[in-house]
Amino acid sequence: MIRIVYTLMIAACAALAMPLSSSAKDGELNRAWQNAVLAAVDSFPQNGGYYTGRKSTPEFKKSAWRAFNEAYNMRLADPRPNFDPKKATPSFCSLATYGAFIQALLIWDTDGKISRMAWFNIKPLVGITDVVNEKGLNQRDGEGCWGRANANGPGFAVLVAELKAGYNFTAFRGAKTEALRESKDEKYLTDEQWCKHSIWAEAEPGDFMKIFWNRNETAGSDSGAIIGVDDNPAAEQEHGHSVVFLGYDDNGDVKYWSSNGPTDDPVNAGYGIASCPRTRIQRVVFTRITNPENFDRAASKMKFNNLNKWLDALNGKRHGTTKELLKECGIK
């Protein structure tokens, strides 16, 4: 079991004006929910394997999809799932954070605010036939709750915005290459400017976080400026990570929990705490849930095939823009 020590920043970072950023709303923090997220993270096993494939292998007898389906454990007559994080192995990042969300919602919902039908629609449909998914349906990116959370771009942020369960805030360091800049005024912030950006002081442990990796120094790629995956196999594409934000370590590096991979040793990868310098992040979207009771709206508003067309387009059709990201995430 993971035991987390949360180290917060001692001093607030200085605010820095930046065209492509938004702020957290002062005072809007549901402490009971944030604590539920941290308790949920603590309930997951350590490691368990990192695997995105759908077929069994000598290393992984079950896929992450099948394992998560078994971990959800909900029968037709059940009012809510009996979710078991220890069964949800192996895993990958978006499945890990979605699992943490489910576990947090179960911990928080002590008086049945989330209806049985909402729980049915929150369940990921991953192509496996069971009593809830009788037809063995598989939600593609942008479909229903899981299809949104698993999508390229800020999928989970879009889900929260659509259900009005919280709000999102974001910052973008800017594109380093002129070809990927969306306006003539767009600048690529220096390391010092980016590390002092006000967004780092606004984040709270228990926020969900979508990282767009900065690969300019490590891979000579400006892909951190890209949202989604287009139809050109030769083009640069999004490289991201879905995580739960935990605070900062003693060096001021971002500390987070997720299923972390791929690695050279996938069997011993998976769930755990990791950290990275702020300079490794080129764009970030934080999601703060303030009204978890509104996930009950999934009962009527998130049927299994309810499609967000923008997230669907980010899966092999076209890249998104910052303007679109702000709109879809409800950021003004």
Model-based region annotation:
Residues 51-52, 205, 310:
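Mature extracellular "passenger" or substrate-interacting domains of secreted, surface-exposed proteins
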Residues 1-5:
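Positively charged n-region of N-terminal signal peptides that target proteins for export
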Residues 253-332:
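Low-complexity, Gly/Ser/Thr/Pro-rich intrinsically disordered linker/tail segments
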